[in-house]
Amino acid sequence: MDRQCSERPYSCTPTGRVSSAVSQNSRISPPVSTSMKDSSCMKVHQDSARRDRWSHPTTILLHKSQSSQATLMLQEHRMFMGEAYSAATGFKMLQDMNSADPFHLKYIIKKIKNMAHGSPKLVMETIHDYFIDNPEISSRHKFRLFQTLEMVIGASDVLEETWEKTFTRLALENMTKATELEDIYQDAASNMLVAICRHSWRVVAQHLETELLTGVFPHRSLLYVMGVLSSSEELFSQEDKACWEEQLIQMAIKSVPFLSTDVWSKELLWTLTTPSWTQQEQSPEKAFLFTYYGLILQAEKNGATVRRHLQALLETSHQWPKQREGMALTLGLAATRHLDDVWAVLDQFGRSRPIRWSLPSSSPKNSEDLRWKWASSTILLAYGQVAAKARAHILPWVDNIVSRMVFYFHYSSWDETLKQSFLTATLMLMGAVSRSEGAHSYEFFQTSELLQCLMVLMEKEPQDTLCTRSRQQAMHIASSLCKLRPPIDLERKSQLLSTCFRSVFALPLLDALEKHTCLFLEPPNIQLWPVARERAGWTHQGWGPRAVLHCSEHLQSLYSRTMEALDFMLQSLIMQNPTADELHFLLSHLYIWLASEKAHERQRAVHSCMILLKFLNHNGYLDPKEDFKRIGQLVGILGMLCQDPDRATQRCSLEGASHLYQLLMCHKTGEALQAESQAPKELSQAHSDGAPLWNSRDQKATPLGPQEMAKNHIFQLCSFQVIKDIMQQLTLAELSDLIWTAIDGLGSTSPFRVQAASEMLLTAVQEHGAKLEIVSSMAQAIRLRLCSVHIPQAKEKTLHAITLLARSHTCELVATFLNISIPLDSHTFQLWRALGAGQPTSHLVLTTLLACLQERPLPTGASDSSPCPKEKTYLRLLAAMNMLHELQFAREFKQAVQEGYPKLFLALLTQMHYVLELNLPSEPQPKQQAQEAAVPSPQSCSTSLEALKSLLSTTGHWHDFAHLELQGSWELFTTIHTYPKGVGLLARAMVQNHCRQIPAVLRQLLPSLQSPQERERKVAILILTKFLYSPVLLEVLPKQAALTVLAQGLHDPSPEVRVLSLQGLSNILFHPDKGSLLQGQLRPLLDGFFQSSDQVIVCIMGTVSDTLHRLGAQGTGSQSLGVAISTRSFFNDERDGIRAAAMALFGDLVAAMADRELSGLRTQVHQSMVPLLLHLKDQCPAVATQAKFTFYRCAVLLRWRLLHTLFCTLAWERGLSARHFLWTCLMTRSQEEFSIHLSQALSYLHSHSCHIKTWVTLFIGHTICYHPQAVFQMLNAVDTNLLFRTFEHLRSDPEPSIREFATSQLSFLQKVSARPKQ
């Protein structure tokens, strides 16, 4: 034992004894006895003077006192005791590593690691002593000790030369030792050597070189160490790494003669092709050997030798991925010096039979062909490595390499292996080209085919998973291709953008993507080295939460880098052509994704858009003098996305809009914005993982600080204000694009987009609506989108935008809406109402529509001899007429219609005349056809006629409307021959009803008398001749002026106008003495009522009516009572024509005397009410019509209440409810009138007309219901019996309501009649 201890370097006796004691009895607990501690302390104290590893002072100061020295000795004693305890504890833990279970082993290793960080030298000494004291320990125990020693050496800051030599010798002795643990035992020993290299790699490298150049093929462990050293990035500094690589090259040069040694060459090839425990990962020894082989071939001067070795290598199996990568690396390294030879070998190998069989056109003949299945992948990787390693001479070869790669891509079996090989090779090729000087002076003609392969590859990527870097690699390659000459054509570039956007943006949500991706990822390979791991005591934790968490983190990183690759590609494209056209081209492919219905697609698209704008804003690549193209569309889309429900989309949209604002300001001022740091003028080359120049990580890493936020106030504004400020910087064309974008957004199915589009449209019109030039197409588009807007607030804002737009573009909007108003639907009508929401605009809309009515083309042969009208013009005219009709009912146009009544009134009458002109026959026709042609179709004249009716009714002139409606005079407006009579009746009604609009209409029609259009002059003279009877005429047109106007009419080209002017000149207004003459003719005319001829009587009654009209304000005087009495006597005449004429004359008399209070006439009116009421059911339609009209006129004279309701009832109501209302109006006036009316009704019970008898019976029935006593006091027995018989007869009436009423009245009558009279 003493001998052993004396031979140990820097070994201390106490530690040795403790080690011996522990080794002799493994069951002793870690704490040692007190005696042992004392003995150890003495030994340690004796040897402490010659040790340099202790940290306490070795010199005793002589001037210290005895007590100070005693204290120092006590401290040293405690320190030595602590070290001894630590050594003993470590020794015991090293011993327990042999039998510890996995969990205890993990605990021991952790404790030793902590000790090594505090005192690595002590731990190394303890482990060394343990090896010396226990030479027969098991291989598994040694394996664990090697691992521990590797950890301790790595934790040590300095490794002393003695320990370095000792552990180097220990490693070299065990690296080649064969044990039951196989390779993992050797690798553990080799890793010790690697750990020593951290402190002194040159010494280790010298050992390795010596072993490598012996002429005997080196052992696997030696290659393992060299492989680890070559692949590690942490062992060497940059300078040492270069030295190591240079030393490898020198080793390769010295190894060239070995290529001629058959045994060495075969051993090399066998080692390279022997399958490993796993082919998923390349072992360090194989990875180094492929590199070393390539360096040797690179150093070989004989090209034939190089070809022979490469051919032999390629003829081995290509089944495993790492094998293919290694072959490609060897070929690439050889190509650095032997490019022609390598190219020839690859070309020959590509044409060989195994390769041809591996293509899809030929199926494998047997299972051995499986080793050739992925040979195409090897070739692809080889071309990539050739380009990467021989980049100094590669430019002339690029097109050839690309053509070969494209060929193998298209004609090889498609799988993940081929795809990844193709991408890897292409990345290496693009890297070599980009790093080659003079690449920009070359033109590469195969880039478009390579780009097509990339697009095919991305389209084949599964759309629901993201497991690989294929997408980002393909986009990085595309970014590099964009820099080469010649530039990519627009069509291919468009395909590239569409493919990339679809492949990235259309990926599912991250949660769904994570779920799908984790299912596709391979679980940990628990079969890796199963026997060796089991023997070594290794464990596997399984596929648990940590693995899932790793999957999530991996996916997040993969997704982020994929998005960054897309952003980098967009930045590369804009850098190659930094123009506004190129920016618009790129953004135009983004718009479809910015408008996606899926939130995550919008979020991704707007993020890429924001990154691109931020890149341009911070680097100022675009020329400030160049105008943006269609930037308004981008502003509109970003503005809508600022209202996106997704918060991330909102933020990106707002930030993108802010950067866009700064770009616009830059272009406006003509000064490029500068980045915080100096902006590069070219995109920097992507690093190994392809990070873009400006990406989302940069955004997160450098957020806008408070100072920059304060400087760039735009980033502090809300989205509404940002978009509003941007609008201020847009040109007119850009504003139009923005508005068009907003209009398109109205048709979206996303509620938020519709709402945002309406707000933006309203804002744009509010701020800049007056500047817009052409709004017709915009208005049409709004109409198309309006039907799909179901959000009330959005529709309201859209219509409000139309209202604001109409302030400056009324005529254009009216013309546009006219073109889409046939047929008129609710959405178009809403637009018309929006036009009139402003009072000034509503007047202008009506004026514009009236101006449209002036375009009245006539067919050939019409009175104006105008050319044949175009169909479009006629439809426009019809639409204007229809809108004038519909807008009268719109609340927004109520005031405008009221104020524009005179113009509308004359225009509608003129339009009706025009429509009737269109329906005149153009040539002589048979009698029946002529009659049909003379009657216009309902569509031709109904619109203007209905518009006139609604004008009268909606503006408060319903009295005038009632006059024509109750007479059924609207039919007069349907033929050209009766049209003048209809206009005359309407004008007469206005005069009789004292219409307030007569002065205004007069002022409006006077200019029409001078119109070049005959129809306008005709309408004006028709109305003027009737207005001559109005008292207010002289307020507008003095008598002399009226005479002048009528005299001028005598010279009018139109015969009709001349006749009407002549009739006007004969008016009593100009001949006052004519009144007495006409009054004197009334008595003889009344005597003529008793002529024998019916026609004569009717004609005389008509003459009397005309005389009453011509007398005008003078009236008939006292003769009115006689006219009334004479006329009433014919109400019950058996002759229909005479009854009708009598009622008409009575009505004219009542109207003529309406302003005069004659008690006798009022009595006649009271007495005529029941007959008129009963004749409402007259069998003769003419009599019934005249009865209605006269009844209404009498009610007006008597000043009944609810006249409008009375008119509506007379005009349109039917049934018992109408009869009840008329009875109520008649019988509730006064007791005197009640008696008169009831007496008259009772007298009609004896009528020979069944209709009259039925009608009066119902009338009396209503009276009995409400005034039974008053009725029965006036009934005699005959009248009562007659009532019973009549009600009994009505019980069988065909009308159910009358039968029901008769039954109830009969029962009631029986009960009342049975009561005794009081």
Curated annotation (Swiss-Prot):
Residues 1-38, 676-695 are annotated as: Disordered. Residues 12-38 have a biased composition (Polar residues). InterPro entries: ARM-like, ARM-type_fold, HEAT_Maestro, HEAT_MROH2B-like, Maestro-like_HEAT, Maestro_heat-like_prot. Keywords: Repeat. The keyword Repeat applies. GO terms for cellular component: cytoplasm. It holds the Pfam family HEAT_Maestro_2. HEAT repeats lie at residues 581-618, 769-811, 840-880, 996-1033, 1037-1074, 1076-1113, 1118-1155, 1164-1200, 1278-1315. This is Maestro heat-like repeat family member 5. The gene is MROH5.
